[in-house]
């Protein structure tokens, strides 16, 4: 029973390198093609990849979405076909039909196995057809679910310009509507900001979240120079040496490394703005690095926690236990948030973790456990699902946050589950989305309580005696 709970002194890290299941990273196409409005995503893989995208995203091919499959066949794998000519034909067709500003090639497991030189092909083809081609190797051999976005943003980060003309400065980063669109003059707008080096935020989140976080920083006089990715490829933010960068998601370590090493940016190590506690710590870390004082953040956080609906949800979670099997790399941030809500985290499974990139989040998790008086959880990287199921059986948690592969089998054994994929697609960042995040977490608990009231307590029907 105590195998998954560490002593109160420090977080306990383990690595099992077992068989774990996550969503395929090529699923990042689902939200990135909508985020970058003038893009076209070409997934280079097999029919299996196509079936996955078609079913996972639920988009009918008749809708002509801005993504497509380049299906590899036997001739491609046996090197009997010319890869360059085939990809050129497809890209010319995309250019003719959709005329995108950028084409993103998504590499898959098959392109890795047959060693396709996508970068070399893209560089040659880009010069021939006149459209930028970004290559991202989002294969399931090397990456977990959300790391697909990480590979795309890391490739796009290298395309960000260092210097832009003065007249372009306002349109870069996709924030001109927030800062300039409603103002008659630039001088009046500049008065509300402190003077500080450029700040770029990286991570793909829905437009309402972009607006919320940008305006939260604006309240403290912090100007956001741009977001990566921007809504349009031509609006990628300028990143010159010395630009400060900060992430909004814990799975973007490769992007952070690229920005620091290739673009000579300065990374702000901060917790991630998930939940009011994380959002407050995120803003404080940015302000501290930029040397800007903040006011009213503690009151803003308390206001969110004291909202009647948030209080009701927290009361429902208080004293309950949660177990993370690991899927989307949001586990550390969600665990910290749920500990603050009064839950006990028994184990945090996570497919991959960069301890340097998540250092501030880990420190906040540790501090939150101490303040709430609960044991610090064991963090298991690359968890072995068989071993995890044995631990779940022994610990009997009130809630298991897991990938879709294990949800129904666990439910059939009387374990309450929540799909981790829902947190990936939901709006969970910032002060304003706390209620939505808690609604997601508590939904299976409220559902089970409602079913229990109806007398429906078992998922599997017992055989009737004859």
From Swiss-Prot:
Question: Which transformation does this protein catalyse, written as a reaction?
Answer: chlorophyllide a + oxidized 2[4Fe-4S]-[ferredoxin] + 2 ADP + 2 phosphate = protochlorophyllide a + reduced 2[4Fe-4S]-[ferredoxin] + 2 ATP + 2 H2O
Its Enzyme Commission number? Answer: 1.3.7.7
* Positions of [4Fe-4S] cluster binding: 24, 49, 109
Among the GO molecular function terms of this UniProt record, one is:
metal ion binding
- rRNA-binding as UniProt keyword: no
- HAMAP family for this protein: ChlN_BchN
Specify the protein name.
Answer: Light-independent protochlorophyllide reductase subunit N
Organism for this UniProt entry: Synechococcus sp. (strain JA-2-3B'a(2-13))
- Write the gene name: chlN
């Amino acid at each position: 029973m105590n195998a998954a709970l560490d002593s109160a002194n420090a977080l306990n890290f383990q690595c099992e390198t077992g068989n774990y299941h996550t969503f395929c990273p090529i699923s990042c196409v689902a939200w990135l093609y909508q985020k970058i409005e003038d893009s076209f995503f070409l997934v280079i893989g097999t029919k299996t990849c196509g079936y996955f995208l078609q079913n996972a995203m639920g988009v009918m091919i008749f809708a002509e979405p801005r993504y497509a499959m380049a299906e590899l066949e036997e001739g491609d794998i046996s090197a009997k076909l010319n890869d360059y000519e085939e990809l050129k034909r497809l890209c010319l067709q995309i250019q003719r039909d959709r005329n995108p500003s950028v084409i993103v090639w998504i590499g898959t497991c098959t392109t890795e196995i047959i060693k396709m030189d996508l970068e070399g092909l893209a560089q040659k083809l880009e010069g021939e057809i006149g459209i930028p081609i970004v290559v991202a190797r989002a294969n399931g051999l090397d990456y977990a679910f959300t790391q697909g976005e990480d590979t795309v943003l890391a490739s796009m980060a290298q395309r960000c310009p260092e210097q832009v003309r003065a007249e372009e400065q306002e349109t870069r980063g996709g924030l001109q509507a927030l800062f300039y669109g409603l103002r008659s003059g630039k001088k009046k707008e500049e008065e509300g900001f402190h003077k500080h080096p450029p700040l770029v935020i990286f991570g793909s989140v829905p437009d309402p979240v972009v607006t919320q976080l940008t305006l939260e920083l604006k309240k403290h006089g912090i100007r956001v120079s741009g977001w990566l990715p921007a809504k349009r490829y031509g609006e990628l933010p300028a990143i010159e040496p010395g630009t400060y960068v900060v992430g909004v998601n814990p799975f973007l370590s490769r992007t952070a490394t690229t920005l620091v090493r290739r673009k000579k940016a300065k990374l702000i190590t901060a917790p991630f703005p998930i939940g009011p506690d994380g959002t407050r710590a995120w803003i404080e870390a940015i302000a501290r690095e930029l040397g800007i004082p903040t006011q009213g953040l503690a009151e803003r956080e308390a206001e969110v926690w004291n909202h009647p609906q948030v209080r009701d949800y927290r009361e429902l979670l208080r004293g309950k236990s949660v177990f993370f099997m690991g899927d989307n790399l949001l586990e550390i941030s969600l665990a910290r948030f749920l500990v603050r809500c009064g839950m006990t985290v028994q184990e945090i499974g996570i497919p991959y973790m960069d301890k340097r990139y998540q250092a501030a989040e880990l420190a906040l998790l540790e501090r939150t456990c101490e303040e709430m008086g609960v044991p610090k959880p064991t963090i298991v990287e690359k968890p072995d699902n068989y071993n995890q199921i044995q631990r779940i059986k022994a610990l009997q948690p009130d809630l298991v946050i897991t990938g879709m592969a294990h949800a129904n089998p666990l439910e059939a054994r009387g374990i309450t589950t929540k799909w981790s994929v829902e947190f990936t697609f939901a709006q969970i960042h910032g002060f304003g989305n706390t209620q939505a995040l808690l609604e997601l977490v508590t939904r299976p608990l409220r559902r089970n309580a409602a079913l229990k009231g109806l007398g429906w307590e078992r998922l599997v029907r017992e055989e009737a005696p004859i």
